[in-house]
Amino acid sequence: MSSPSDTDTSHTDASSVESTALDIHLPTTEDAADIADGLVTLRRALHENAEVGLDLPITQKLVLDAIEGLDIEVTKGNGLSSLVVVLRGGQRTEDSTGVVPAVLLRGDMDGLPVPEATGFDFAATSGRMHACGHDLHTTGLVGALKLLHRDRDSLPGDVVFMFQPGEEGYDGAGKMIDEGVLDAAGPRVKAAFGIHVSADQDLGVAYCRRGSYMAAFSKMSITVRGKGTHASRPATGRDPIQVGAMLVGQLQEYVTRRFDIFDPLVITVGQFNGGTAPNVIPDFAHLVVSVRTFSDEVTTRAEAELPQLVTELVAAHGLEAEVDYERVLPPTINNDDEADFFLETFADLFGADRAVVRPNPIPGSEDFSRVLEQVPGAYGHFGVALPNLPVEEREANHSPRARHSDEGLADQALFLAHLAGRKLARLAQE
């Protein structure tokens, strides 16, 4: 994929769309500026009231209040605080397959169980925090809805807005798919897009890439069962802590010698618990390992080989291992054409110098991967570092000191609106 930064840095009026027989109007930068203050107010209310998990009643109400009065179809989730909003276009046009196209835009809404230490005057005080910037995702999606609503009469198809709880470890995307979000407009959506803000990346710069974008996440839980005894007489027992400690090193050594660095496997022993007293060798120890992979081949190999390695190593020391291996999330894979479209649209709106092709995938994981497994689309990042904050003082997402600027909200909303509107224009011509 050629980088937009290699092209002419001039960009077009935000309302223009590629030539089409349809009279399509999309929002302008002036339209986005008109709603900017309201977006900042909403973002700060969401931030101050951060909630965790699948049940986000305050967040859901703030969104509903923000979109009240719009000519839209709203469906609340069953058992989770999701919202699915459908905006019907006024020039709904069947494509070559006889289907009125629909495009999905997604914004996740949940926070993290992190006590906030940003110093913001709108900081949350509940022990929960929007440390990953999902308050901006939610607000940007509300902004895109409001902008497209103004121009709904010219849209040649429908837009589905996916307000998702439970991204942070609750598989909210999977649950919304089970409840039918991909088919909310009637026929299945033809494309899906999402963006994630980054507190440590330059304000107003977008990042994307073709193909593998974020890692798959698997979890391996290990119980090493030994034989407890007095700490002064280890030979009369079987020490699970010593064997567990050996596993930590052996797992890393195995990965570095058996897996290709150009199709990487990254593992981390994030939990290691065993024992209740310093003078007792316990009966068991427990380890939990996170496993990150970028390809189906390595994901499958890791699932087959790592539990076998653990079982054999533990048995060699005369102990037993119980291993539970769970695939939690698939990799986030961008469609090549949609990744190109993502960056081309951003470059056209804001200049090619602000649209960057990521050279490598991101080792974190994301449940929007569930959507991209079923629908072609693209996921990217958007920098929201505080203006004039030195790079060395920027804290990354998930830090209690991660400070996300809301100065890019209008651009974020405009970009999402154009992703949907321009994609509908293309689909209507196919």
Task: Give, region by region, the residue ranges found by the protein language model.
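Non-cysteine beta-strand/loop elements that form the S-adenosyl-L-methionine
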Residues: 104-106, 196, 220-222, 379-385
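Metal-dependent amide/peptide-bond hydrolase catalytic core
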Residues: 2-4, 18-21, 242-430
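Acidic/His- and Gly-rich active-site-bordering loop/insert found
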Residues: 4-13, 18-130, 135, 139-155
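Histidine/acidic-residue-rich, glycine-tolerant segments that coordinate divalent metal ions
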Residues: 92-93, 112-129, 135-136, 148, ...
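Conserved acidic residues
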Residues: 71, 188-190, 376
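Divalent metal-coordination and catalytic microenvironments
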Residues: 46, 85, 105, 134, ...
